[in-house]
Amino acid sequence: THGCGYCAACRAGFEGGCQGHDRSTNFSSGYQAEYVRYAHADWSLVKIPGQPSDYSEGMIASLLALADVMPTGYHAARVANVQKGDTVAVVGDGAVGLCAVIAAKMRGAKRIIIMSRHKDRQELALEFGATDIVEERGEEGVAKVLELTNGDGVDAALECVGTQLSTETALAIARPGAAIGRVGVPHTKDINLSDYFFQNAIIAGGPASVTTYDKSVLLKAVLDGEINPGKVFTQSYSLDDIDQAYKDMQERKTIKSMIVMD
């Protein structure tokens, strides 16, 4: 989701929708190989001070998280306009959802509810700043979030999965006038938005503004030790084992796989 830095989208801080290059080729220039052809690198690459040897493995993992999952979680919180004192719900406990917890806390959320059914992810979410865990899904999950918020619903719902169920859940738990930040890649059927007309909900989201967030907020937060998103990487694999890395994520054997180039 890198941008050119010059088009209207990039100038507005939404380089995930960059008009300066063909987004359909975003993943066709060697992004899972030893070398990458990176367009618009003069603007979109983010320089990290010093040398790799200056940093611990944990710090390098957190810096790597700035290439995708942390900015994506931050994007959900930004477009949902999470503010100080808000009650926020995060739908999804993958790496992006966990980073959305970090982002909500960074932006001052007072209460952060994560919808999660996996113990290892629940523990990490609590470490990152979540205050409540909701294991239920569907109507039961919606009812639980509403119970936790005295029937009001949340000020912001961060949808980090992209399924029909997760999207409908995010819409159902948002209070009237709330915002839904959608960063889960959509794989949904038709959703009848007329059902939510009287809710006055704001729905926003899409590919994250990685470069903008890294340069303005996230790189400094990592280097200063304020956040540690690299903890989402729970297994490492060689490039030759990339198929296994994907399989283990799909089977919930790891939260986020790290590919190490030998």
How should each PLM-predicted stretch be described?
Residues 4-91:
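NAD(P)H dinucleotide-binding glycine-rich loop of Rossmann-like/cofactor-binding domains
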Residues 80-82, 149, 161, 173-175:
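A generic alpha-to-beta junction signature in SAM-dependent methyltransferases
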Residues 90-93, 105-169:
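Adenosine-nucleotide cofactor-binding segment
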Residues 97-98:
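N-terminal Rossmann-fold NAD(P) dinucleotide-binding loop
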Residues 117-118, 186, 209:
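Residues in the short beta-alpha loop(s) of Rossmann-like NAD(P)-binding domains
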Residues 168-172, 212-262:
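C-terminal hydrophobic helical "lid"/dimerization subdomain
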Residues 172-189, 203-204:
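ADP-ribose/adenylate-binding Rossmann-like module
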Residues 184-199, 215-219:
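Rossmann-fold NAD(P)-binding glycine/threonine-rich loop
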